[in-house]
Swiss-Prot record:
InterPro entries: Mechanosensitive_channel_CS, MS_channel, MSC/AndL, MscL_channel. GO terms for cellular component: plasma membrane. HAMAP family: MscL (MF_00115). SUPFAM superfamilies: Gated mechanosensitive channel (SSF81330). Channel that opens in response to stretch forces in the membrane lipid bilayer. May participate in the regulation of osmotic pressure changes within the cell. The chain crosses the membrane at residues 11-31, 70-90. PANTHER family: LARGE-CONDUCTANCE MECHANOSENSITIVE CHANNEL, MECHANOSENSITIVE CHANNEL MSCL. The gene is mscL. This is Large-conductance mechanosensitive channel. Homopentamer. It is a multi-pass membrane protein. It is found in: Cell membrane.
Length: 128
């Protein structure tokens, strides 16, 4: 049992797991911000542009059930904004990684084969 707890601790404290946990918390908070932006600012403005339409009231009845397609439309707008923000974030992060890789690639690696050939030639000359 003690060994399993130690293994779990080692797993949970790895950098990747902690990074993932932080990303999930930040992502949840970001999702709430975007939902508020869509619900309280974007959709009311879109409603005004469409002649005073209130998306929260868009629904129809099927028997006793109420289909609230206005809320669904707001969820789609939420998704599009979050997906676009993640796309931009990944694009920026990827460009930073590529720049870093290019910097590493640009540093010349000493030509070890050339050095070895020079050493060999010098040793041959010394033996003569």
């Amino acid at each position: 049992m003690k060994k399993m707890l130690v293994e779990f601790r080692d797993f949970a404290l790895k950098g990747n797991v902690l990074d993932l946990a932080v990303a999930v918390v930040i992502g949840a908070a970001f999702g709430k911000i975007v939902s508020s932006l869509v619900d309280n600012i974007i959709m009311p403005l879109v409603g005004v542009l469409l002649g005073g339409l209130d998306f929260t009231d868009l629904s129809f009845k099927v028997g006793k059930s109420v289909i609230q397609y206005g809320a669904f439309i707001q969820s789609i707008v939420d998704f599009v904004i979050i997906a676009f923000a993640i796309f931009i974030f990944v694009k920026v992060l990827t460009s930073f990684i590529k720049k870093k890789e290019q910097t590493v690639e640009e540093t010349p690696v000493p030509p070890t084969e050339e050095y070895l050939k020079e050493i060999r030639d010098l040793l041959k000359e010394q033996q003569k």
